[in-house]
Amino acid sequence: GSLAEARSKCYEALAQSGDAVVRSEAESLLGLINMELLFSPAPMPEKEEYAVQAGDSLDRIARKFKTTVDLIAKGNLLKSDVIRPGDRLRVFKGVFAIAVSKAGNDLVLSADGKFIKRYRVGTGQFGKTPAGTFVIVDKIVDPPWWRPDGKVIPFGDKENVLGTRWMSIAAVEGTEHAAGYGIHGTWEDDTIGKQASAGCIRMHNADVEELFILVPAGTRVTITE
């Protein structure tokens, strides 16, 4: 229960303190604690006990709870996709949302309005990353990169700039349509925390791999100046 207690104390600090240092430390600690809880069978208020039914698959359970197969598997330490009726799983039932600040070059992951973790990101040079409300559409592991001239650069090619994961985003709710934008990894870690990309949101590969496990397609992404 000590992780849960530490988590509660950190949320109290965030709710009560206006001190930037205290808030930053609480956020850092929460990022670590939340990942520890999400990626293990440890209980948390945002998880539900679920008994596997006849005919269930991880994909079906993931759709039912609007989560990802990866998170169910990792959170229950499953060695394979094979599940049997009567197996008990702890399944995350919260709704993730992503908020990207262009000025701050950071990305905040929340669940049901609660802070989960803050990541450093790189955004578009000259303010090229569009602001507005989006949702994640496609999620691709080891993505190929479509160069601006239309040539496809396969994953593993030195010229492919997308890193290890790609999540495309589409505009919703009156945000102007902007094609070709997304959240991806990078091979150039020194560009994180800067406005250096062609407009996409880039993350350290380890960070985008973590986020990729957590957020399903349909997750809202809000980008602010």
Tell what function each PLM region has.
Residues E12-P45, V69-S101, T224-E225:
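Extracellular LysM carbohydrate-binding repeats and other cell-envelope/extracellular binding modules
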Residues D207-E225:
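N-terminal targeting pre-sequences for secretion and organelle import
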Residues E12, K47-A51, S57-I61, R120-T123, ...:
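Second-shell loop/turn segments in exported
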Residues L3-A4, L37-K66:
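Primarily a LysM-type cell-wall glycan-binding module
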Residues G55, G86-L89, G218-T219:
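Loop/turn positions that initiate beta-strands
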